[in-house]
Curated annotation (Swiss-Prot):
Pfam family for this entry, one: Carboxyl_trans
All copies of domain CoA carboxyltransferase N-terminal, residue ranges: 226-495
Recorded GO MF terms: acetyl-CoA carboxylase activity; ATP binding; carboxyl- or carbamoyltransferase activity; zinc ion binding
GO cellular component: acetyl-CoA carboxylase complex; chloroplast stroma
Family designation: Belongs to the AccD/PCCB family.
Documented applications: Overexpression of the accD operon increases the specific activity of acetyl-coenzyme A carboxylase, increases leaf longevity and seed production. The accD operon consists of accD, psaI, ycf4, cemA, and petA in this order.
Primary gene name: accD
Binding site residues for Zn(2+): 230, 233, 249, 252
Protein name as catalogued: Acetyl-coenzyme A carboxylase carboxyl transferase subunit beta, chloroplastic
Pathway linked to the protein: Lipid metabolism; malonyl-CoA biosynthesis; malonyl-CoA from acetyl-CoA: step 1/1
Length: 495
């Protein structure tokens, strides 16, 4: 077995706060834990690039966990084997690179730069002639390589320093990463085998066996609340930055779910929001009780969890100075389901907008009618549609429907599709019956993407697909086109 040692670290730069990590595993083969000491965690590397006679390596590193900030940065390491052959390991967070190369010109410069450092180290530690794996190109370090590089990131999380990171395996699947599983608390989406505390993950051209302690897993579980998982690419987005990015995934640009409060903050000018009917709550009209939890208890639970009284917020505000009536559904409250209170609040909003001659916006995010209220929830479809009929046809006012993911069931079948202008968000899931319901009922497979906004837009179901960063300006232009102007412009026109 050949032993490899990190000779020196070329650069030390201050840690980039927002970083991404891409393990380029193409040059690495299987990684297995074959160390004689079971209490010591090692990383063995097979199949180095362009080396047929290499079997594996036992890698030690130059610093402890406390120096993780220096490790996760733009650093280059010199690696030498027992024969004196040298390799450079380049680790660049900014450009998502982790490479191993044999560049002699670079290595000569590197060895020259650290010649004095090695001499100083030898004087302090003495010559280790008795070690058959020690030569003039190497020096021992006081720390061993504790784990795979993901464990380093794991330790970094334990230091409670906030980072915005993406962890991409060689197969570009976040589920293959140990830190992904630790943060998300779920299993890899690819096939994996778990035996005791050992995990084996299959990546492109490599096998990873990671020995992990239960303490590490328990520690990382504590940080799950710091991250939001993308529904599309399964990447991790740092929650602190996500709101400023309008809940759009940094890795793939997918539009993640937003709370009703965040949407109001996105669309309505600061200081102009005036909510309506905040004290209206459900009273369990049909006394629905399930074996798991009574309906009233579920309502109370969601009220505590979301801080809302119901699955919709309604009110009056200004959008770029234009007075508007707006209702925003919240999927976090019982899946945005439409019960009698939701229907009543939306109906009152429409009637108020009709009386005050205001444009109307309803942002839809719902699983449909609320089954716990039976036929009363179904009647909300007819009630809201009737109010919209008076608003649109009799009052000749302007209603914009915004469909977000997901919009299904009774909401799709009623006011969701009644807008004068219907706008959908990118990648929004929009349907009457969901995919699972259709497949279980008809025993047929629903084609992938057939209920996505882009596919339905091609079929003429919507007028526009508008990203979140453009939505407010698009709505403002639509209102001006329909003779709804900001208050200051309107008053100047009257004068």
């Amino acid at each position: 077995m050949e032993r490899w040692w990190f000779n020196s670290m070329l650069f030390k730069k201050e840690f980039e706060r927002r970083c991404g990590l891409n393990k380029s595993m193409g040059s690495l083969g299987p990684i297995e834990n074959t160390n004689e000491d079971p209490n010591r965690k090692v990383k063995n590397i097979h199949s180095w690039r362009n080396r047929d006679n290499s079997s594996c390596s036992n890698v030690d590193y130059l610093f402890g966990v406390k120096d993780i900030r220096n490790f996760i940065s733009d650093d280059t390491f010199l690696v030498s084997d027992r024969n004196g052959d040298s390799y450079s390991i380049y680790f660049d967070i900014e450009n998502h690179i982790f490479e191993i190369d044999n560049d002699h010109s670079f290595l000569s410069e590197l060895e020259s730069s650290f010649y004095s450092y090695r001499n100083s180290n030898y004087r302090n530690n003495g010559f280790r002639g008795e070690d058959p794996y020690y030569n003039s190109y190497m020096y021992d370090t006081q720390y061993s390589w504790n784990n795979h590089i993901n464990s380093c990131i794991d330790s970094y999380l334990q230091s409670q320093i906030c980072i915005d990171t993406s962890i991409i395996s060689g197969s570009e699947n976040y589920g293959d990463s140990y830190i992904y599983r630790a943060v998300c608390g779920g299993e890899s989406r690819n096939s994996s085998e778990n035996e005791g505390s050992s995990r084996r993950t299959r990546t492109k051209g490599s096998d990873l066996t990671i020995r992990e302690s239960s303490n590490d897993l328990e520690v990382t579980q504590k940080y799950r609340h710091l991250w939001v998982q993308c529904e599309n690419c399964y990447g991790l987005n740092y929650k602190k930055f996500l709101k400023s990015k309008m809940n759009i995934c940094e890795q793939c640009g997918y539009h993640l779910k937003m709370s009703s409060s965040d949407r109001i903050e996105l669309l309505i000018d600061p200081g102009t929001w005036d909510p309506m009917d905040e004290d209206m709550v459900s009273l369990d009209p049909i006394e629905f009780h399930s074996e798991e939890e009574p309906y009233k208890d579920r309502i109370d639970s969601y009220q505590r969890k979301t801080g809302l009284t119901e699955a919709v917020q309604t009110g009056i505000g200004q959008l770029n100075g234009i007075p508007v009536a707006i209702g925003v559904m919240d999927f976090q409250f019982m899946g945005g389901s439409m019960g009698s209170v939701v229907g009543e609040k939306i109906t009152r909003l429409i009637e108020y907008a009709a009386n005050q001659i205001l444009p109307l916006i309803i942002v839809c995010a719902s699983g449909g009618a609320r089954m716990q209220e039976g036929s009363l929830s179904l009647m909300q479809m007819a009630k809201i549609s009737s109010a919209l009929y008076d608003y649109q046809l009799n009052k000749k006012l302007f209603y914009v429907s915004i469909l977000t993911s997901p919009t299904t069931g009774g909401v799709t079948a009623s006011f969701g599709m009644l807008g004068d202008i219907i706008i959908a968000e990118p990648n929004a899931y929009i349907a009457f019956a969901g995919k699972r319901v259709i497949e279980q009922t008809l025993n047929k497979t629903v084609p992938e993407g057939s209920q996505a906004a882009e596919y339905l837009f091609q079929k003429g179901l919507f007028d526009l697909i508008v990203p979140r960063n453009l939505l407010k300006s698009v709505l403002s232009e639509l209102f001006k086109l329909h003779a709804f102007f900001p208050l200051n412009q309107k008053s100047s026109k009257i004068k």
